[in-house]
Amino acid sequence: MIYHQFPCRLKKVSLSTVKRKDLFMKTLYVSDLDGTLLRKNETLSPYTIKTINALTSSGMLFSYATARSLNTAKKVTEGLNTHFPLIIYNGAFVKDNITEEILIANYFEEDVYEVLKDLFAHEIYPIIYSYQNDIEKFSYIPAKATSGMLAFLNSRKGDKRTNIVTTESELMYGNLFYITCIDKPEKLQPFYHKYKNK
């Protein structure tokens, strides 16, 4: 929900009160997607689309920040007129919503390879997102994929970013920016506590 400098929640906004183009020019409103703008079925309600589009047409600055990629974020926000840059992959990138140009990039530093080697040593093989020759990819080793990973990957069938690999070195190739581990909680929790502040 949007609360900042606004007298009420988004769903209670009266569109008739939004008249001046400069009404919202000093505040950028940024919302999460999952669990906030999106419904449980990962869609926007017609009311949300209508309200946000009316507000942005009246001059409100609006964007969203999400753990999703630009690809999946755009699918679930179809119909939303958001022309402001978007924060994706939990802040790994800020991208232009129109041209999809990377405006800000936060790649992992070299010490990520030590973390990955630690995971591999404990039979945890994540899905790794990277840029390879200026092309966004997500790489994984099918033979090492958990049932949870396979379910996740199944929801991404046909995604042009898919990069199936067979070795650890191939999995770590490119400019890495996002790692997704999907396994049993008892297997992942020790690593969460070990690396959460790094």
Range-by-range predicted roles:
Residues 11-12:
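Polybasic, lysine-rich low-complexity intrinsically disordered segments
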Residues 27-40:
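Asp-based phosphoryl-transfer active-site loop
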Residues 44-150:
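Active-site phosphate-binding/coordination module
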Residues 122-124, 129-198:
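Conserved acidic, metal-coordinating active-site core of Asp-based
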